[in-house]
């Protein structure tokens, strides 16, 4: 797993909408983005690791679905999280 508890808690605290918020769309997208960054770096050095590449594609698809949901429900929150994380769409 790419994220240790301290890093995960830091991300949750940064993107949480409330005090006990750990599962909002923004938090999920931020956590997925960190895992995607980790796997991208991993695959730069381990080019033949096809199982990790498949996992990366699944994570990207999950993040895309969450971002689509957020865009359809609350466009302002979508713009905020997109700009904060540097995601294209």
Swiss-Prot record:
Give the SMART domains listed for this entry: Ribosomal_S15
| A Pfam family that the UniProt record links to this protein | Ribosomal_S15
Q: Which GO terms describe its molecular function?
A: rRNA binding; structural constituent of ribosome
| Annotated HAMAP family | Ribosomal_uS15_B
Q: Which PANTHER family match?
A: RIBOSOMAL PROTEIN S15, BACTERIAL AND ORGANELLAR (PTHR23321), SMALL RIBOSOMAL SUBUNIT PROTEIN US15M (PTHR23321:SF26)
Task: Tell me the subunit arrangement.
Answer: Part of the 30S ribosomal subunit. Forms a bridge to the 50S subunit in the 70S ribosome, contacting the 23S rRNA.
Put simply, this protein is called: Small ribosomal subunit protein uS15
Organism equals Sulfurovum sp. (strain NBC37-1)
What is this organism's lineage?
A: Bacteria, Pseudomonadati, Campylobacterota, Epsilonproteobacteria, Campylobacterales
């Amino acid at each position: 797993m790419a994220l240790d508890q301290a890093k995960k808690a830091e991300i949750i605290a940064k993107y949480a909408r409330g005090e006990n918020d750990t599962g909002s769309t923004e938090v999920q997208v931020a956590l997925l983005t960190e895992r995607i960054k980790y796997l991208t770096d991993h695959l730069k050095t381990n080019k033949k690791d096809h199982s990790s590449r498949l996992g990366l594609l699944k994570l990207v698809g999950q993040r895309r679905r969450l971002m689509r949901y957020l865009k359809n429900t609350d466009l302002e929150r979508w713009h905020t999280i997109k700009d904060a994380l540097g995601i294209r769409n």
